[in-house]
Curated annotation (Swiss-Prot):
Keywords in alphabetical order: GTP-binding, Hydrolase, Metal-binding, Nucleotide-binding, One-carbon metabolism, Zinc
Signal peptide: none
Family: Belongs to the GTP cyclohydrolase I family.
Catalytic activity from the UniProt record: GTP + H2O = 7,8-dihydroneopterin 3'-triphosphate + formate + H(+)
Keyword GTP-binding applies: yes
Enzyme class per UniProt: hydrolase
Organism, as annotated: Streptococcus gordonii (strain Challis / ATCC 35105 / BCRC 15272 / CH1 / DL1 / V288)
Protein name stated in the entry: GTP cyclohydrolase 1
Gene: folE
Amino acid sequence: MSDFEKLQETVYQLLELVGENPDREGLLDTPKRVAKMYQEVFSGLGRDPKDEFTAVFSEGHEEVVLVKDIPFHSMCEHHLLPFYGVAHVAYLPSNGKVTGLSKLARAVEVASKRPQLQERLTAQIATALDEALSPEGVFVMVEAEHMCMTMRGIKKPGSKTITTVAKGIYKENVHQRQEILSMIHHD
C-alpha cells in the first residue's frame, strides 16, 4: 500500500472515529481529496528553502532589498490547523550580491509548506537567506492568524501573531532595524 493510499485510509478511519459515515454521498471522495491536500500543503517537507536561491547576481547594489506582504499559509504542528498571513523579507547586500526577487517568495513558500511553528518559519527563512547570500544583514517579519486560536481553545478570531528574526547589521544596529521596520509599515 502506497503512502497516498495509507493517508486515504487514515482519513477514512478518522471520519469513522468522529462519528461520521465516510460512505455517505458527500464524503465518498473526501479521503482522496484530503490526501491530495496534505501532499500539497506539506510539499516543503524534505526541501531546504536555501536551495531556492539559485540565481545570485553581482549587481553592485549596496542598499536595502525588501519584498513585503508575501502571502503564505502553513499548518500549525500542534493542531494541524492552518495559520496564514504575510512575510516581509529584507536584506542588505554584501559586495553588491543580490538574488532574484521571486527567490525570496519561493523560500517563504518552501519553508511554510510543512507542519510548522511560526517562530521556526521566521528563523528558517532568515537563515536560508543569510546562508545563501552572506549579506550584511537579514530581517524577516512574519504576521499570521492561527486557526488554532480562532476555531478552538481561546477562540480569538482576528488576533495576529508577529515574529521577527534579525541577523547581522539588523541585529546589531537599532537604527538599521528601525529603517527596515518603517519600510515594512509604510504603505
